[in-house]
UniProtKB/Swiss-Prot annotation:
This is Cytochrome f. Belongs to the cytochrome f family. Heme binds at Y36, C56, C59, H60. Its cofactor is heme. It is found in: Plastid, Chloroplast thylakoid membrane. SUPFAM superfamilies: Cytochrome f subunit of the cytochrome b6f complex, transmembrane anchor (SSF103431), Cytochrome f, large domain (SSF49441), Rudiment single hybrid motif (SSF51246). InterPro entries: Cyt-f_TM, Cyt_f, Cyt_f_lg_dom, Cyt_f_lg_dom_sf, Rudment_hybrid_motif. One of its GO terms (cellular component) is chloroplast thylakoid membrane.
């Protein structure tokens, strides 16, 4: 009887451990998968500051290029592509949160004019869906449908991101007019260097917090280092914690200065922003322009015919 109870208790403990591990895995994966949009959405009401700077640059410190391509003009209530390109060397590997090396992820924020929004699925053509792949876009806020975010997603597959955009119709949205509008984009590749709370990630360089001598370097069991520095000013011991990931540059007995790099900078990614312009074109203007061109062409044709007729009359008079 006691053996049966013991077996049941062991079975219960194993089941509980597996359940807890599964829950932690799901939470961790969700946190990693949603990190890029959540960091910006939780910390800022608007991703573009009054200065024009996109807030993602607060966490992604390195400056890298980004490119956006949109049509020169679009008609009301039509779907068009906004193609964002986030170029980088596909051979590069970044430091992951666990200290290991892995591929770079990418993410983007697209700030559209008021009234422009993500196209509904039933308005997207099969060709455009093929370009989009399996990406899932979301709005920055429920009340900001004109600001779209995506990522992080694998950079190997999505260094070029196609956003399906629905142009507004001034006939149904009175605050929208037939004008030229700006579009802003921010794109990152790789992990950030600073978290929104101001703490450093393991994807950045770590500097000394004191001037002195490195007395001892302790390699931590789960990775990373504890660097004990004897402060030159008062002899007290300062401990700098280095997470797993960055490579150590100093050794025991070495003299170091305040703010001297203790590690290499493992960051291979960065953030960039750009802009483009799109004209919301009035169909009546296009019809008027086409009518004008047709009138000019017809006038040219009639002029040529009239000239030929005049030449024939002149020729007949000369013969007479």
């Amino acid at each position: 009887m006691q053996t049966i109870n013991t077996f049941s208790w062991i079975k219960e403990q194993i089941t509980r451990s597996i359940s807890i591990s599964l829950i932690l895995y799901i939470i961790t994966r969700s946190s990693i998968a949603n990190a890029y949009p959540i960091f910006a959405q939780q910390g800022y009401e608007n991703p573009r500051e009054a200065t024009g700077r996109i807030v993602c640059a607060n966490c992604h410190l390195a400056n890298k290029p980004v490119d956006i391509e949109v049509p020169q003009a679009v008609l009301p209530d039509t779907v068009f592509e906004a193609v964002v390109r986030i170029p980088y060397d596909m051979q590069l590997k970044q430091v992951l949160a666990n200290g290991k090396k892995g591929g770079l992820n990418v993410g983007a924020v697209l700030i559209l004019p008021e009234g422009f929004e993500l196209a509904p699925p039933d308005r997207i053509s099969p060709e455009m869906k093929e370009k989009m792949g399996n990406l899932s876009f979301q709005s920055y806020r429920p009340n900001k449908q004109n600001i779209l975010v995506i990522g992080p997603v694998p950079g190997q597959k999505y260094s070029e991101i196609t956003f399906p955009i629905l142009a507004p119709d001034p006939a149904t949205k009175k605050d929208v007019h037939f004008l030229k509008y700006p579009i802003y984009v921010g794109g990152n590749r790789g992990r950030g260097q600073i978290y929104p709370d101001g703490s450093k990630s393991n994807n950045t360089v770590y500097n000394s917090t004191a001037t002195g001598i490195v007395k001892k370097i302790v390699r931590k069991e789960k990775g990373g280092y504890e660097i004990n520095i004897a402060d030159a000013s008062d002899g007290r011991e300062v401990v700098d914690i280095i997470p797993r990931g960055p490579e150590l540059l100093v050794s025991e007995g070495e003299s170091i200065k305040l703010d001297q790099p203790l590690t290499s900078n493992p960051n291979v990614g960065g953030f960039g922003q750009g802009d483009a312009e799109v004209v919301l074109q009035d169909p009546l203007r296009i019809q008027g322009l086409l009518f004008f061109f047709a009138s000019v062409i017809l006038a040219q044709i009639f002029l040529v015919l009239k000239k030929k007729q005049f030449e024939k009359v002149q020729l007949s008079e000369m013969n007479f």
